[in-house]
């Protein structure tokens, strides 16, 4: 069954037009905008390869738990396929570029998220951090990181113990809602609201993590420097984020996401020098 056919099945309304969505994001999920016979348009995505299947199935489970001005309307979900259908955001503004107005909107988003209690049923940030791994993965096998050219072996010999120690102190406790995958292709602006998409990694924890995941991508896209956007970062959170990218940037690409490693190398090249500076280490 095709994705438009799944939309018809779930909504009980004929699809009279279909526009595939390509580009953006890092997964190979099937995506598109359906024009419905009742005049509505909706965005739908389907997981059909490893990685996207688990991500969309997870999002189908999490999405009904979510509420807030930053959550697009859920139209339908079928975790068995899996298929997710939400409101169409084609007319929204998707950064970059980053204007002062968009950056101000992003600050409002951070405040909204920090004020939002995570719904019951979300995984914990502490569990997600343990499951994902960061510098401990590099300590077990530093080879992939060294192939990126971002660090030398000598620098890693000197810095790795401090990075492992710092990430162990990262604050994970908390009951706030975290998106945990904030970057420009996962958010848009419309009618004074910031709307977040791709909620499959949402957790309950300390809200400082979302800001630090987001701000380095703004610098990468020509926006302000990370030190302007987060002048007082938590050293442990920053160390863990750098370690997350360090452990993955040199690995083969996962199935269905051929471009993600290049992006992670670019992220590492911004976050690791920042983390090193905050921790008083030499520049990699």
Residue spans for each PLM region:
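Juxta-kinase regulatory segment immediately upstream of eukaryotic protein kinase catalytic domains
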Residues: 1-20
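A short beta-turn/loop motif at secondary-structure boundaries
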Residues: 22-26, 77-80
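Active-site acidic catalytic loop and adjacent metal/ATP-binding pocket
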Residues: 25-36, 43, 164-209
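A conserved alpha-helical element in kinase catalytic cores
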Residues: 40-80, 92-112, 209, 218
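Hydrophobic residues embedded in beta-strands of well-ordered beta-sheets
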Residues: 41, 82-84, 194
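Short pocket-lining segment of the protein kinase catalytic domain that shapes the ATP-binding cleft
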Residues: 84-91
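A cross-family kinase active-site recognition segment
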Residues: 93-155, 173-175, 203-204
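Helix-rich C-terminal or lid/interface subdomains of diverse kinases
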Residues: 204, 212-284
